[in-house]
């Protein structure tokens, strides 16, 4: 906890030093001294009305990462740390261009950390801490192995926080996923988010604590609530998706899990996976209909099957509802190839047929998950995809064929993804490395590299605004990309209106003069027709929009403070200066305006300009 508090303090001080503005000077009594976004708070991501994941400035981003497991499987650390240096491996992942690391965990290990429990598992789960102290002296209490061959490992939570710090220094973000309730190598085979050892309330407690602990560190930008909810009705225990409050209703549980996180940190992205089976209600099926009906085996199924966690058909009629936090939802299916299972859409038993993108869309992808991005309802992050592509494991080449179809589709649709996996010890897929985590599979990496976010010149783009991705000099920061020589995507035009007052609304519908209504539950500035005689004349623009990006966010507060700190370098444009004068209009631009905008963005005041 000491490290966490020091990071918070350092971040607050740094923001004032960098901007050259006192964090508390000349503040009115009614204005909070909440700091503008600093290096620990400027990388949070959100979803806009076009179903794009964007940064604080509204710029679209592309999360392209990989998985590295171990914490879920009982090692109390990443797999491979038993043979190689953890810091070095994290550097390698970032240097290879992965800007997001998905880390499978368990409810058990998070509650252990919360309660300062021992690294032995307490008799529950499969827990054996596996760290090579010779390769990882920094993970030992004494800095290595002594002359007598003795050493003491640091506590696993302290080691985890070292990993978080090393990801931060690499400009690489983290998403954890609750892979299972109980720590176990095969824990993911349990279908639900609770089991005999850990209840749903335990799961919610773990999510809440983790979100609160890291709320001031934007290295961890997302939480995947539960890995692969699944199960078939005929198996007795299964995940469903409807509008009920049934204990096995994943949609309802996901709403509770999301709120457990967002009530602690409203800036987290929440990844929500699907289920396995969804009834064909139009044909009379329900949640008691067997997914595999052996009594009618040769007849068309009345249940739509999918990969575990991959079935998002239920979102169409019953989307996850978390009110004003809708802007933090990203749906996250998983998809695999025929080497994991010979699904019917691969036509592996019919030599006269094969699959392609269109057949995959028609037979499986579109109605199962792709409609969400095709129809721009929600962004998608493919949380797991991958497999063997070498001739020994994939002699027909059909697994690589599937991987290429999915990879290219994700590139075309800018679907976010985390490749499965870095580990070499994933039995049915292999990994990006081999030789006991010592060498990279260059053929597989070259295949995946095509789907990593990079510039035309091959520079990998990170998700951190200040720190370039990796240590190898082949990565850039988000600010480098959007403020440098690289041409960003063309921004969409929005309407501008002459006005005198901006008011906060939580309405779900915003109507623009240039477009049809779009759905959003984020707080949205709308224009009031009420005039204010005390306000100065303002030309076309949006009051509070200091950086002229046509919206009001904490980025405007940052722009004001930078303007005050160094007008030559960060000076606002003339219209931006007019828009920025929101606190007692007519007094000119001061730090008070920045804090008023922060309060407005945090819903602590509901109207701009703000007057006393």
Annotate each predicted stretch with a short phrase.
Residues 356-358, 362-488:
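Substrate-binding cleft of secreted/luminal carbohydrate-active enzymes
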Residues 179, 334, 563:
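Histidine-centered active-site/metal-ligand motif
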Residues 82, 194, 204-221, 226-413:
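Extracellular glycoside hydrolase catalytic/binding regions
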Residues 2-13:
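Bacterial N-terminal signal peptides that target proteins for export
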């Amino acid at each position: 906890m000491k490290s966490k508090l020091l990071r918070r303090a350092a971040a607050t001080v740094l923001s004032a030093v960098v901007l050259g503005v006192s964090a508390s000077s000349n503040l009115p009594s009614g204005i909070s001294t909440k700091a503008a976004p600093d290096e620990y708070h400027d990388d949070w991501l959100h979803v806009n009305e076009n179903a794009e994941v964007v940064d604080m400035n509204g710029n679209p981003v592309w999360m392209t990462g990989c998985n590295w497991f171990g914490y879920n499987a009982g090692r109390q650390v990443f797999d491979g740390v038993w043979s190689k240096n953890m810091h070095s491996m994290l550097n390698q992942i970032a240097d290879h261009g992965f800007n997001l690391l998905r880390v499978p965990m368990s409810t058990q290990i998070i509650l252990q950390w919360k309660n300062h429990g021992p690294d032995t598992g307490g008799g529950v789960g499969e827990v054996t801490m596996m760290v090579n102290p010779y390769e990882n002296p920094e993970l030992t209490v004494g800095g290595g192995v002594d002359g007598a061959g003795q050493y003491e490992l640091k506590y696993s939570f302290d080691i985890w926080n070292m990993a978080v710090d090393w990801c931060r220094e690499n400009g690489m973000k983290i998403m954890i996923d609750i892979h299972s309730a109980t720590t176990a190598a095969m824990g993911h085979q349990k279908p639900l988010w609770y089991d005999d050892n850990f209840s749903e309330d335990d799961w919610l407690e773990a999510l809440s604590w983790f979100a609160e602990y890291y709320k001031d560190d934007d290295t961890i930008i997302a939480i995947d609530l539960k890995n692969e909810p699944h199960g078939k009705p005929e198996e007795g225990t299964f995940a469903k998706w409807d509008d009920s409050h049934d204990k096995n209703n994943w949609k309802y549980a996901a709403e509770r899990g999301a709120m457990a996180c967002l009530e602690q940190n409203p800036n987290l992205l929440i990844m929500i996976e699907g289920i396995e089976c969804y009834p064909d209600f139009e044909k009379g099926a329900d949640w008691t209909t067997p997914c595999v009906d052996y009594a009618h085996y040769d007849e068309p199924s009345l249940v739509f099957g999918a990969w575990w966690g991959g079935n998002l058909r239920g979102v169409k009629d019953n989307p996850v509802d978390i009110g004003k936090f809708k802007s933090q939802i990203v749906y996250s299916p998983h998809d695999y190839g025929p080497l994991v299972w010979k699904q019917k859409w691969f036509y592996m038993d019919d030599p006269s047929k094969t699959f392609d993108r269109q057949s995959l869309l028609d037979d499986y992808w579109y109605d199962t998950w792709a409609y969400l991005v095709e129809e721009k309802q929600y962004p998608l992050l493919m949380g797991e995809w991958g497999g063997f592509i070498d001739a020994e494991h994939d002699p027909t080449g059909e697994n690589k064929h599937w991987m290429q179809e999915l990879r290219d589709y994700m590139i075309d649709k800018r679907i976010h993804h985390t490749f499965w996996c870095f580990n070499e010890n994933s039995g049915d897929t292999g990994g990006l490395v081999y030789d006991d985590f010592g060498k990279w599979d260059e053929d597989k990496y070259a295949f995946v590299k095509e789907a990593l976010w990079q510039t035309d010149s091959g520079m990998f783009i990170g998700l951190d605004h200040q720190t370039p991705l990796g240590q190898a000099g082949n990565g850039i920061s988000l600010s480098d990309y959007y403020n440098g020589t690289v041409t960003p995507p063309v921004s969409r035009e929005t309407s501008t209106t002459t006005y005198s007052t901006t008011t906060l609304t939580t309405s779900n519908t915003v109507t623009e003069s240039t477009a049809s209504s779009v759905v959003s539950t984020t707080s949205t500035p709308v224009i009031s027709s009420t005039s204010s005689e005390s306000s100065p004349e303002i030309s076309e623009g949006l009051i509070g929009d200091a950086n002229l990006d046509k919206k009001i966010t904490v980025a405007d507060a940052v722009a004001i403070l930078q303007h005050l700190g160094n007008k030559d370098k960060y000076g606002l444009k003339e219209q931006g200066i007019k828009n920025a004068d929101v606190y007692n209009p007519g007094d000119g631009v001061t730090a008070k305006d920045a804090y008023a905008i922060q309060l407005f963005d945090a819903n602590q005041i509901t109207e701009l300009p703000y007057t006393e």
